[in-house]
A protein has these predicted regions:
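Conserved RNase H-like, two-metal-ion catalytic cores of nucleic-acid enzymes
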Residues: 7-8, 18-57, 75-76, 80-87, ...
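Extended two-metal-dependent nuclease catalytic cores across DNA- and RNA-processing enzymes
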Residues: 2-4, 25-29, 79-254, 483-485
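Short hydrophobic beta-strand that contains or immediately precedes a catalytic carboxylate
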Residues: 9-10, 134-136, 379-381, 460-461, ...
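Short alpha-helix plus adjacent loop in nuclease-associated cores
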Residues: 76-90, 146-174, 230-232, 408-426, ...
């Protein structure tokens, strides 16, 4: 007898794992540092089922804690699975609370897996004629499919697939769903550690089941098999039988099908709201709880475009691409290019929305749109160009949006004279100081526009940086942000110009009619993201950091990047010749010490020489493939074991110096400007520091003599001096401020050498009696201990025994007791909140701070100690940079800021501005933030970077 009822039974853990791993590269971390990926993904999946399928009855099955009958029968059952990720373990109780709030029954029976609970209920429901859907990605459920019982299978790329009898038969190439058990019994199931028959794969299993029908019949007729296959099957009869037992889902679990208890009920919205608020699912509340309910349950809104722009982070396609690290891959032979369509089915696109995107390609249209843009207080802008390097890119077009769902694209011709005329018409729009300029990586657009003689003026809002401030560990690209915050799938640039490679087109190759929708979408989506993210900034107490520190820095970086820096290429050529000869000499020394020639660049050959031939240590570390580990870290620890190790390290250092800097830097000179224009990245390091690329200036070695040759090649403009200013011991000063340690504060206020003062305290001697070795050890302790260095680590760094290292650390904390208290307090705060903060409330999330793994937890604890210090130092120099830039602007200073490296600022300064520039720079650096101890900046002058610093 058929029924109008529709029963959904969900396999909780299978879906939770899928949700967690869907976000594995970009986990969803809230302001408390809690990983909400599994919860968010599960809720979105549940909502999608409630909305799309409108079940009349529903239940969620969980595996019980403790072993099941399969574990008792087979100790290795699921033994190879990695321990449950801590984020999942912590999420499960919350997910259960959410399910309770939805008033959905949780189904759990001691000793039986969720598979067996669902199998029992689904089988009984099917017998009663109830249409039943088992929602799971696990392949073994295929054995339960009948006329009334279906698999509701999540696809790898999003969306769902309903599988009935014919679908299961087709996927497994079998005659009956019941034969799924026989297939698994023969081929095994690696995800559950079901052994199967060794040497029998899927195709062989299909062939055997097609011929014999079942494992039992196969084992009774092994005489019909031949050769190696016969031997395999006969040798493993017991294992095959046992594997089938493990793969068989039980349908007689002691649980009753009580349909009245599975009826879908109205959710407890107050409870859901409370949980979602605690998890900081603010926009999920808008999408799930503030819309009309249907069919007695909470459902997702279908949403207009306006609603979409304000909607919650909806899942990326919940089920990642094939080959990802996920549990229970559903049918190993599933294939297909479903990604694009499946993804679009879950997200809004331009095709599903009513947007007014206009191509502005006549003088009349341009004049009209300019007047319209000038009246707006907010302007979202974007540029289309010929390349990704802003100093070389040519404008192809400009797009603008001032109202959601409306945008305008202005093509710019190839002819530079004509292009300048059009861009110049829009100068009043860009230079209108009364309108807020919104962009996604707006620094790029500003540099491109300045190459056309136009400055972007007025307050700025960069959506990429806004998201970085909120979630520094995640990606910040527009496509990703649109999916997460707007539930929207953007047009990808590859759809216009093709995939990367030699055949990829240029935007200039396309007709404006083929570009304008893409370009308009960029400006429109950026405006929508701004409207969402500005609320998030306010709710997360991040407005000061964003508006007062990060945004004022953008025009500074535009200026630095456009200024560029000159290189003394002749000096680099001479250095190249010198270091190449030095490398060749060291090579010969290495061969003599080793007693043979070998490829020094080959880690394999280096390992064989060091550990097989020279046997410098007894037990050398190896990789999984059996190759010796010869990393820099390993060789550093072995430096004292044999002279050849020192030489190999020296050789590697020179090779890196040549390849990364000395020979590479001249290749980065822009032929148009004759300068190197490094790119400064505001959204890369989670610490808040700036990073740089092309070239990476942050990693230039500065302590050894060889590294100094690189700095010598950086020179000022003609008729100018090179000026360098850097903070003195800023991180120690911040530690003194944060810890409020009286002894450390007194040392700084007395203007003592902090390392000598520390040594005097530790060794209990007068300051005048501190020798160079004592000071060196105290300096190592000062910088090492604030980074949470261990006794072992300090001993290694100082090349002393652990007893002396421990005494030094104990003496340090006795000298600065409040420093130790600060360190302990920082860890405690991180454990309670999941994050720590800088002076300016920049958050560093530490999801592993409560990990049960001591190594992982220890790393998080060290970050808890150091992140507020390092991050505050980064914030302070950003403040100083913005203020110096403003002073230069208002006072008409011609000097240029040309480089920033960690705590150091560098300038090209006309000789006649020498005294004034030094005065401004030092004043602004030392007054960037008021602390318990003064900030101090040292400076120097020269004809190159090396002389100045």
């Amino acid at each position: 007898m058929e029924s109008d009822n529709k029963l959904f039974l969900l396999d909780a853990y299978a879906l939770i794992y899928r949700a967690y791993y869907a976000f594995i590269k970009n986990p969803r971390i809230n302001s408390k540092g809690f990983n909400t990926s599994a919860i968010l993904g599960f809720v979105n999946t549940l909502e999608e089922v409630l909305k799309k399928e409108n079940p009349s009855h529903i239940g969620v099955a969980f595996d019980p804690s403790g072993p099941t009958f399969r574990h008792e029968a087979f100790e290795q059952y699921k033994a190879q699975r990695e321990e449950t990720p801590e984020a999942i373990r912590l999420s499960v109780p919350i997910i259960k609370d959410i399910i309770h709030a939805y008033r959905i029954p949780i189904l759990e029976v001691a000793g039986y897996e969720a598979d067996d609970v669902i199998g029992t209920l689904a089988t009984e429901a099917g017998r009663q004629g109830i249409t039943t859907y088992m929602m799971t990605p696990d392949k073994d459920y295929g054995q339960l499919v009948t006329d009334n019982v279906f698999m509701y299978r999540p696809k790898h790329t999003g969306g769902f697939e309903v599988m009935g009898i014919e679908e299961v038969k087709a996927k497994f190439d079998i005659q009956s769903p019941a034969q799924v058990i026989d297939m698994l019994g023969l081929m095994g199931d690696a995800s559950d550690n079901i052994p199967g028959c060794p040497g029998v794969g899927e195709k062989t299993a299909q062939k055997l089941i097609a011929e014999f029908g079942s494992i039992e019949n196969l084992l009774e007729h092994t005489d019909q098999l031949k050769g190696a296959l016969k031997t395999k099957v006969e040798t493993n009869k017991e294992l095959i039988t046992f594997s089938k037992f493990l793969a068989t889902i039980k349908i007689d679990v002691p649980i009753q099908l009580e349909m009245d208890k599975l009826v879908r009920e109205q959710a407890d919205e107050d409870s859901l709201r409370q949980i979602f608020e605690e998890l900081e699912f603010r926009t999920l509340i808008d999408r799930v709880l503030k819309k009309e309910n249907s069919a007695g349950g909470v459902t997702m809104a279908t949403g207009s475009k306006t609603a979409t722009a304000k909607s919650a982070p909806s899942p990326l396609p919940l089920f990642p691409e094939e080959g990802g690290a996920i549990q229970g891959d559903l049918f190993a032979n599933f294939t297909g290019n479903e990604a694009g369509e499946a993804k679009k089915s879950n997200l809004e696109t331009l095709e599903t929305l009513n947007c007014d995107y206009q191509l502005i390609d006549t003088e009349k249209k341009r004049a009209e749109i300019i007047q319209k843009l000038l009246t707006s207080k907010i302007l979202s802008l974007d540029t289309e160009t010929t390349g990704t390097e802003p100093m070389d890119a040519e404008l192809v077009g400009m797009s603008f949006s001032i109202t959601e769902n409306q945008a305008f694209y202005v093509p710019v011709p190839d002819n530079r004279e004509e292009a300048l005329k059009i861009v110049n018409k829009f100068r009043p729009v860009f230079e209108n100081e009364n309108s807020l300029k919104v962009g996604q990586n707006i620094k790029y657009d500003m540099i491109v526009l300045e190459n056309y003689g136009v400055q972007v003026k007025g307050a700025l809002f960069d959506t990429m940086i806004a998201h970085y401030v909120l979630q520094p560990e995640l990606r910040h690209g527009m496509d990703y942000l649109a999916e997460i915050y707007l539930h929207y799938q953007t047009i990808h640039i590859d759809e216009l110009i093709g995939p990367k490679g030699k055949n990829q087109k240029n935007m200039r190759d396309l007709d404006p009619k083929d570009i304008y929708r893409y370009a308009c979408e960029d400006a429109d989506v950026t405006l929508k993201l701004k409207n969402v993210l500005e609320k998030e900034l306010k709710e997360n107490d991040a407005e000061r950091l964003f508006y007062d520190i990060e945004m004022p820095l953008v025009p500074v970086l535009v200026n630095i990047e456009r200024n560029g820096v000159l290189l003394d290429t002749e000096a680099l050529k001479q250095s190249s010749v010198h270091f190449t000869a030095q490398m060749q000499r060291i090579e010969q020394e290495i061969y003599e010490l080793a007693g043979e020639t070998f490829n020094i660049a080959s880690p394999k050959q280096v390992g064989e020489v060091l550990f097989d031939k020279l046997r410098i240590i007894e037990k050398a570390k190896k990789t999984k493939t059996g190759q010796y580990v010869t990393s820099e870290e390993v060789l550093e620890s072995l430096r004292h074991k044999h002279p050849v190790v020192e030489k190999i390290l020296e050789h590697r250092g020179l090779k890196k110096l040549l390849g990364t800097y000395i020979d590479a830097l001249p290749q980065l000179i822009n032929p148009r400007t004759g300068r190197v224009h490094t790119s400064f990245n505001q959204t890369v390091p989670s610490t808040g520091r700036l990073s740089s690329s092309n070239p990476n200036l942050q990693n230039i070695p500065i302590r050894d003599e060889n590294g100094k040759e690189i700095r010598k090649a950086f020179i000022p403009d003609e008729g100018c001096l090179f000026f360098s200013a850097d903070y003195s011991q800023i991180e120690l000063r911040i530690m003194a401020h944060l810890s409020e340690d009286k002894n450390m504060i007194d040392a700084f206020l007395s203007n003592h050498d902090i390392h000598a003062a520390t040594a005097a305290k530790i060794y209990k001697i007068d300051l005048k009696d501190v020798d160079s070795d004592m000071r060196r050890k105290a300096k190592t302790a000062n910088f090492g201990i604030i980074y949470g260095i261990s006794v072992f680590g300090l001993a290694e760094r100082m090349n002393v025994d652990r007893k002396e290292a421990k005494e030094l650390i104990d003496g340090y904390f006795e000298t600065y007791p409040s420093v130790k208290a600060y360190m302990e307090k920082s860890i405690q705060i991180a454990q309670e909140k999941g994050y720590v903060e800088t002076i300016f409330h920049r958050k560093r999330f530490l999801p592993d701070i409560n990990s049960r793994n001591a190594v992982v937890r220890g790393y998080a604890e060290r970050n808890a100690i150091n992140a507020p210090i390092q991050g505050s130092a980064a914030d302070i120099i950003k403040v100083a940079m913005a203020r110096i830039y403003q002073r230069f602007q208002t006072e008409g200073i011609q000097a240029k800021m040309i480089l920033q490296v960690h705590d150091e600022l560098n300038f090209s300064v006309p000789v006649n501005e020498k005294e004034r520039v030094e005065e401004i720079v030092i004043e602004e650096m030392e007054h960037a933030y008021r602390m318990h101890v003064p900030l101090k900046a040292d400076c120097g002058w020269g004809k190159n970077w090396l002389e100045a610093h």
